[in-house]
């Protein structure tokens, strides 16, 4: 199989498990050297790197806690060092903003601190990651933000998360216009309910799963690999004419 991303470098945030790991594995399979970030789960990041290397790919992991605003410059210092050692350059071709934490924070339960924590990871971090990446990102590069169907469809148990993801959609559109002269494409991928470790408790509720499946045109919840496939297309040469779009990959959730 032709490796469409051979010679490219990619940064995928929040890739120790779930959708982020699936994206990292897919981009590596397609030939990219992948830097993946993790926060709480070093073991998960190590497993992701090992799986990529076992499949013949190249990857390395960097710790990053995006609640802390000092993390972004530290991340890029470490990324620069690692890429320069490996490639002789800190050039970056693909950026995937995926990092997250628990988004299940109800309206009545939210406090200023918990609101700030969610917004720091889901909104502030992607903004400043892109800002820091631009000096390294090649002309013709790719920025792919992981949004959510919750940005446009009511999810009453996660209003702060929904707010943040709506902001990501808007940021995507603004950046696409801003970076068009450099032929950098900027898109968002908005998953619906997807089978990951992060929502295992919900998946163990058969009634909830049935309700979600009933609201989905294709009649089931998604798999991380299905989100990764959309990201891989946008990262490839074939995706070069798509920019400023939020692509919902939800199996037709709440059509």
Describe the function of each predicted region.
Residues 130, 164, 172:
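Active-site helix of classical SDR
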Residues 9, 16-17:
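Conserved glycine-rich cofactor-binding loop
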Residues 153, 232, 243-255:
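Short C-terminal tail/terminal secondary-structure segment
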Residues 148:
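Residue(s) in the substrate-gating loop at a strand-loop-helix junction
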Residues 108, 140, 153-159, 181, ...:
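Active-site loop immediately N-terminal to the catalytic Tyr-X3-Lys motif
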Residues 135, 177-181, 240:
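Alpha-helical segment proximal to the catalytic Tyr-Lys
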């Amino acid at each position: 199989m032709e490796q469409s991303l051979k010679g490219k470098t990619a940064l995928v945030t929040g890739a120790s498990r779930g959708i982020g790991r699936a994206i990292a594995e897919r981009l590596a399979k397609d030939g990219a050297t992948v830097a993946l970030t993790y926060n709480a789960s070093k073991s998960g990041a190590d497993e992701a790197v090992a799986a990529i290397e076992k499949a013949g790919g190249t990857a390395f992991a960097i710790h990053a806690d995006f609640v802390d605003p000092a993390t972004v410059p530290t991340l890029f210092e470490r990324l620069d060092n690692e890429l320069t050692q490996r490639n002789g350059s800190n050039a970056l071709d693909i950026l995937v903003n995926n990092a997250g934490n628990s988004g299940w924070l109800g309206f009545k339960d939210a406090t200023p601190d918990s609101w700030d924590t969610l917004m720091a990871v889901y909104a502030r971090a992607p903004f400043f990651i892109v800002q820091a990446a631009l000096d390294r990102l090649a002309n013709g590069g790719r920025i792919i933000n992981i949004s959510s169907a919750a940005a446009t469809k009511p999810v009453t148990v996660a209003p702060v998360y929904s707010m943040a993801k709506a902001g990501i959609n808007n940021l995507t559109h603004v950046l696409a216009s801003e970076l068009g002269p450099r032929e950098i494409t900027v898109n968002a991928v908005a998953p619906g309910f997807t089978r990951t470790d992060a929502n295992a408790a919900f998946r163990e509720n058969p009634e909830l799963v049935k309700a979600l499946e009933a609201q989905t045109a294709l009649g089931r919840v998604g798999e991380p690999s299905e989100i990764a496939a959309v990201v891989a297309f946008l990262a490839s040469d074939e995706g070069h004419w798509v920019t400023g779009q939020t692509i919902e990959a939800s199996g037709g959730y709440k059509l």
